[in-house]
């Protein structure tokens, strides 16, 4: 009941009609595209307003919201409070998913290959070069590993999926941390295949026997990819699934403190997926076009209040209510150039307490 009352307040607080515009423009994360599109279908049915979303990658989404060419940017990389303030932006989470390594090994049963974070790092450092290497045999004694060269496929563009993938590798491998660290864009070795966007990563791996790449969970499901098992912080080999992403959120500072800038990788728990990742919506803190920004806020608010089941259907994890409450407080700071709060000023600031 409380959620629905707050939603109604948010919709009317600005005094603008719900159907003020016919279309919202968003761009960014390829990982989050499925949930924004499924939310859009529900939101259009409820409001008449549509969403045009371009899945162009997190880096490009951030560029477009900074340039003011979209109503919201979408990124899998959270902006720190300092970076958001410096850029004049507000960044809040929408849902949670996971990054998943996958392979093209002819004859290999789906979901059976086991890797540790350390070995995965060595593969992407170019230090493990064939699939029959001793460290891979040690992890997979019951599998017939082929004598194939390993062909890493990586992202060429600025990618939130790359950010979380490398954040995980930095957490489990000192060698990786020293060589690359956590980044959205890397100077990959010249003999790696670099693809723009998750869809092209999938195509490149599928076209190359011996290839390994990484994408978010929805691409694994939609393309029936051969995802690997990873050893998590508890020492258990686990497969990527929604319950493992949810366990990571419950173990994290997101749930304990409402801190959605905290990492979700390599967290404790017997079933936790070790490369869990949030995805975020970014809007201007001071909007030159209040009506357009208000429409973006209405869409996100609708997703928070009505989109949990739709997010789960799309294989994403909805946010804990405590995290949503912190997000509302952030959104309530958005104003127009006259200093007037747009849209969400009626939300109680103490809801999270």
Language-model segments: residues:
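Flexible loop/hinge segments at secondary-structure junctions
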Residues: 21-353
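A cross-taxonomic marker for long C-terminal extensions/tails that follow the last structured domain
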Residues: 7, 14, 350-353
């Amino acid at each position: 009941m409380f959620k629905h009352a707050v939603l109604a307040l948010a919709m009317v607080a600005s005094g603008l009609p719900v159907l003020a515009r016919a279309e919202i423009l968003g761009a960014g994360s390829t990982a989050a595209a499925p949930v924004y599109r499924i939310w859009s279908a529900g939101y259009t049915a409820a409001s008449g307003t549509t969403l045009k979303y371009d899945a162009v990658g997190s880096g490009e989404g951030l560029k477009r919201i900074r340039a003011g060419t979209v109503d919201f940017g979408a990124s899998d990389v959270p902006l720190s409070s300092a970076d958001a303030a410096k850029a004049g932006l507000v960044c809040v989470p929408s849902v949670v998913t996971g990054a998943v390594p996958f392979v093209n090994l002819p004859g290999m049963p789906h979901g059976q290959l086991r890797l540790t974070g350390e070995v995965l790092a060595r593969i992407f450092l170019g230090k493990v070069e064939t699939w029959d290497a001793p460290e891979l045999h040690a992890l997979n004694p019951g599998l017939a590993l082929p004598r194939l060269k390993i062909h890493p496929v990586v992202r060429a563009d600025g990618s939130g999926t790359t950010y979380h993938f490398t954040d995980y590798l930095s957490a489990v491998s000192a060698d990786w941390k020293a060589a690359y660290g956590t980044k959205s864009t890397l100077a990959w070795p010249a003999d790696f295949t670099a693809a723009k966007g998750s869809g092209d990563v999938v195509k490149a791996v599928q076209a190359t026997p011996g290839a390994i790449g990484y994408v978010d969970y929805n691409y694994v499901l939609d393309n029936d990819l051969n995802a690997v098992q990873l050893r998590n912080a508890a020492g258990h080999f686990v497969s990527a699934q929604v319950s493992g992403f949810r366990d990571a959120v419950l173990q994290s500072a997101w749930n304990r403190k409402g801190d959605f800038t905290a990492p979700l990788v390599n967290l404790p728990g017997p079933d936790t997926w070790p490369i869990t990742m949030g995805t975020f919506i970014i809007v201007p803190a001071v909007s030159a076009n209040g009506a357009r920004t208000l429409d973006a806020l209405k869409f996100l608010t609708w997703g928070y209040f009505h989109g949990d089941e739709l997010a789960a259907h799309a294989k994403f994890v909805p946010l804990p209510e405590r995290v949503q409450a912190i997000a509302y407080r952030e959104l309530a700071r958005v104003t127009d150039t006259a200093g007037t709060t747009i849209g969400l000023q009626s939300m109680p600031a103490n809801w999270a307490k």
